Regions:
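Short amphipathic alpha-helix used as the core "switch/output" element in two-component signaling
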Residues: 59-71
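Acidic catalytic/metal-coordinating carboxylates
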Residues: 30, 56-60
Length: 123
């Protein structure tokens, strides 16, 4: 699942992820959508923007996804300060990927997410 409030970035992420051979089950533009989609689609992992629009926090959403649905996140951010990173670490992230996204770093993060699953990863 992709959780990104900027539609063009979300579309770019979907192209990258599917190009790496993964399936994207849903794209959410807010924390509330992410939680609803997680209940409906049960993704293995979520690409989560740290700062979502409309006052949504990607970190808080990640906590809910982990607690309610056991979905771990790969955090995406253009500006990840130490305090934000520390807050995100409390939610057992798979990895952090800086924006702008370098495809090879995203691919490595997805591979890291796959290792414990030992099956196809659905985003």
């Amino acid at each position: 699942m992709i959780v990104e409030d900027e539609v063009l970035i979300a579309m770019h992420l979907e192209l990258l992820v599917t190009g790496f051979g993964h399936e994207v089950c849903a794209t959410a533009l807010s924390a509330a959508e992410a939680i609803a989609h997680a209940a409906a689609y049960r993704p293995d992992v979520a690409l989560m923007d740290v700062r979502l629009g409309g006052g949504s926090s990607g970190i808080e959403a990640a906590g809910e996804l982990l607690r309610q649905h056991e979905v771990r996140c790969i955090f995406l951010s253009a500006n990840l300060d130490e305090a934000t990173r520390k807050a995100a670490l409390a939610h057992d992230p798979v990895d952090f990927v800086d924006k702008p996204i370098l495809p090879i770093l995203l691919q490595r993060a997805l591979e890291k997410a796959e290792r414990p699953l030992r099956s196809s990863t659905m985003l």
